[in-house]
Amino acid sequence: LLPHIGFKDSDKGTYINVSYERPLGDKDVVYADLNYYSKAGYKPVYGLEHNERNFKVTYENGWYEDDDEWVRKENNIRFDYKNHHIAPGLPLSYSAYVERGLWKNDDTGRKSWHMEYGAFLNHDRIYLFNSKNTSLDLTIGKKWTRESAEDSVESTNVYYATLGQKISPKWNTWVGYYREDFTSNVFTYDQPDMAKELRNGLQYIMDDKNTFTVVNRYDLDQKENYETKYSWTHKFCCWDLSLIYKHKDIDNDNAFEVKFDFVNW
């Protein structure tokens, strides 16, 4: 049992989360994320996971949130085919997933049998300039989403590219390009905030206990800044304290979050 306590934002308020896991043998785990928000109420997630060498299967019931939209997943089953190399010596690997469940928007009451599946091709991390300090990660893929509420099937190509640079033992920076379209008109949960995103970050490791990070997100289609997030994390002996401030340029919205994560209990 590892508790997490904090203040999320003005819509959710103060929260407490307790995560519980219990093995049911070598390959099966039952788990629960018990989440309570002072404004949103009790939003738990219960699940069962079966793990094999090549794949895993997850069954879940519970609530998930994204951009203030609460979605309840009922009888949600997900199959993940784990990342595998195509052939020995070839720096390419592939992965895939299928997910299906009855989803419900808590605010609108709208329900839909949501089915989503995707496949991805990943390149092994590329180290540039004969140095481990500069790295490039590349992924391409395809996603499909079927919604019973609209009897629709939408798809999108997916392109991810991230270039990372370790400037010094204390400084890291990165820039990423992300391309993905909306595949659901019923839910905004787990959908991209924008179709074409340029993201860059800077991290300063002050010492073994303090880390400061800035992440900026830019909308390439609208040619405007989308969001900037500032975070500071301090490690204590048994728990971590995180202060997070987010400013959304698109609607001039500000959000502040405080997190206490217990790492030894």
Labelled PLM ranges:
Residues K12-E21, Y46-L48, F79, N83, ...:
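Structured alpha-helical segments in the cores of large, soluble enzyme domains
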Residues G89-Y97, K104-W265:
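Exposed, low-structure sequence patches enriched in small/polar residues
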Residues K39-E49, F55-N83, Y97-N105, R110, ...:
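Flexible loop and strand-edge segments within Gram-negative outer membrane beta-barrel domains
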